[in-house]
UniProtKB/Swiss-Prot annotation:
<keyword id="KW-0520">NAD</keyword>
<dbReference type="GO" id="GO:0047151">
    <property type="term" value="F:tRNA (uracil(54)-C5)-methyltransferase activity, 5,10-methylenetetrahydrofolate-dependent"/>
</dbReference>
<dbReference type="GO" id="GO:0030488">
    <property type="term" value="P:tRNA methylation"/>
</dbReference>
<dbReference type="GO" id="GO:0005829">
    <property type="term" value="C:cytosol"/>
</dbReference>
<dbReference type="InterPro" id="IPR004417">
    <property type="entry name" value="TrmFO"/>
</dbReference>
<keyword id="KW-0819">tRNA processing</keyword>
<dbReference type="InterPro" id="IPR036188">
    <property type="entry name" value="FAD/NAD-bd_sf"/>
</dbReference>
<comment type="similarity">
    <text>Belongs to the MnmG family. TrmFO subfamily.</text>
</comment>
<dbReference type="InterPro" id="IPR040131">
    <property type="entry name" value="MnmG_N"/>
</dbReference>
<dbReference type="InterPro" id="IPR020595">
    <property type="entry name" value="MnmG-rel_CS"/>
</dbReference>
<dbReference type="GO" id="GO:0050660">
    <property type="term" value="F:flavin adenine dinucleotide binding"/>
</dbReference>
<dbReference type="InterPro" id="IPR002218">
    <property type="entry name" value="MnmG-rel"/>
</dbReference>
<feature type="binding site">
    <location>
        <begin position="8"/>
        <end position="13"/>
    </location>
    <ligand>
        <name>FAD</name>
    </ligand>
</feature>
<keyword id="KW-0489">Methyltransferase</keyword>
<dbReference type="Pfam" id="PF01134">
    <property type="entry name" value="GIDA"/>
</dbReference>
<protein>
    <recommendedName>
        <fullName>Methylenetetrahydrofolate--tRNA-(uracil-5-)-methyltransferase TrmFO</fullName>
        <ecNumber>2.1.1.74</ecNumber>
    </recommendedName>
</protein>
<dbReference type="GO" id="GO:0002098">
    <property type="term" value="P:tRNA wobble uridine modification"/>
</dbReference>
């Protein structure tokens, strides 16, 4: 019988430990609280929801809603307890966070196959066949050093500096052009063009936009990390024209001239269905981001699948160090799960914990690890964080991660519904087969 350690009893660690234990294997679950706590946690309970009490939308035509349905098919502990302690929240699955965490703690502490060890892990525990690292965005300083040694220090990030991402289908490509600076590269960037008057309007709204206040434990990040676009703009009206909005080296084929200002959109995935605003990390409030960035002519009707942010977040560059099975490339006995892998949101974190647990169970049985089909939201997410790219920025579940349907469907909601039905059908097959 193999020995397994799960480090961290957040959403991902709780799911991983539960999956392994309910599959008949022993697991040691390490949690440093209350011996050592974090600036964001308030209790010693497992799966404590430190920000919102909402696990996102329930509708399967939302990324989060579809992912939770897939998790249900995989026997999710988090989803079942969330439903047990749900509170009215319109179309979202919100919970009584105290009862939710307490119940998960009870289930895991009382499971005969789970041994809970309350201590800070400062080095990789020895004597285990498999180790799942699920230490979350507020990983302790001591264990961060362990992760740095495992992954290479340059592949561990201590903050998110996230720029908004738009659905490529909603960009007006007539308001700009594809091309790289000085004609180098393969034309992977779409350049949204602004004239002087449009820039003036955009600039004034940007510097006056309402910002999200920084939490105490995030203060250092602001200075160490990338400067928010609005802070850069406040240094002077010309600053952006020599920074993220510089037009140098770009010629608009329509005019044969260099534009006054550009905002570059870069492909976020191979299919080019997701485009991110290059250098536009921001602390603007979400409604302000939509309002202000839609002043860019090409983005007038854009759908934002992810909005920008800058906050404290320990995460690895999974695309360089992990396989899609969530195993460490250089040591496949070690798996990562949760927000530390570069997924974003409660549901996505928990879902990767389920997958890590599934793969440990398979390997304990002498089988090869597995990945859900790319047509599923979980399959799309793990492929996104592990497929080759320049740099990984955390991603939430959204429909742009899923491959196109065989037939073109014009109606957006219908298209999402058909993708969701396909995903659930494929996940049902995966759920019935992963144990075999």
């Amino acid at each position: 019988m193999g020995k397994v350690a799960v480090i961290g009893a957040g959403l991902a660690g709780s799911e991983a430990a539960f999956k392994i234990a309910t599959s008949g294997f022993k697991v040691d679950l390490y949690e440093m609280r209350p011996v050592k706590t974090t600036p964001a946690h308030r209790t010693e309970g497992f799966a404590e929801l430190v920000c919102s009490n909402s696990l996102g939308g329930k509708d399967i035509t939302t990324g989060s809603g579809l992912l939770k349905e897939e998790m249900r098919l995989l026997g999710s502990l988090i989803v079942s307890v969330a439903e047990e302690f749900s509170v009215p929240a319109g179309g979202a699955l919100a919970v009584d966070r105290v009862k939710f965490s307490r119940r998960i703690t009870e289930i895991l502490e009382n499971h005969p196959n789970i041994k809970v060890i309350r201590k800070e892990v400062t080095q990789l525990p020895e004597g285990y066949n498999f180790i799942i690292i699920a230490t979350g965005p507020l990983t302790s300083e001591a264990f961060s050093k362990v992760i740095q040694r495992l992954t290479g220090s340059e592949y561990l990030y201590f903050y998110d500096a996230i720029a908004p991402t738009v659905d490529a289908d909603t960009v007006d490509f007539s308001k700009g052009f594809w091309g790289d600076r000085y004609g180098k590269g393969k034309g992977d960037y779409f350049n949204c063009v602004l004239n002087e008057e449009e820039y003036e309007i955009f600039y004034n709204e940007l510097i006056n936009g309402k910002q999200v206040p920084l939490k105490d434990f995030e203060k250092a990040v602001f200075f160490e990390g990338c400067l928010p676009i609005e802070e850069m703009a406040r240094r002077g009206k010309q600053t952006l024209l020599f920074g993220p909005m510089k037009p140098v080296g770009l010629i608009d084929p329509k005019t044969g001239k260099q534009p006054f200002a550009v905002i570059q959109l870069r492909k976020e995935n191979r299919e080019g269905t997701l485009l991110s605003l290059v250098g536009f990390q921001t602390k603007l409030k979400y409604p302000e981001q939509k309002r202000i960035f839609r002043l860019i002519p090409a983005l007038k009707d854009a759908t934002f699948v992810r909005l920008g942010s800058i906050h404290r977040n320990t995460f690895i560059q999974s695309h360089r160090v992990l396989k899609p099975t969530l195993q460490l490339k250089k040591d496949p006995r070690i798996l990562f799960a949760g927000q530390i892998t570069g997924v974003e949101g409660y549901a996505a974190s928990a879902a990767t914990g389920i997958l890590a647990g599934i793969n440990v169970v398979r390997m304990l049985k002498g089988k090869e690890p597995t990945v859900p089909p790319e047509t599923t939201m979980l399959g799309g997410l793990v492929r996104y964080i592990t497929e080759p790219k320049e740099e990984l920025q955390p991603m939430n579940p959204n429909f742009s991660l899923l491959p196109d349907l065989d037939k073109k469907v014009r109606d957006k909601r219908r298209r999402k519904l058909l993708k969701a039905e396909r995903a659930l059908k494929d996940m049902e097959i995966f759920a019935s087969q992963w144990k075999n």
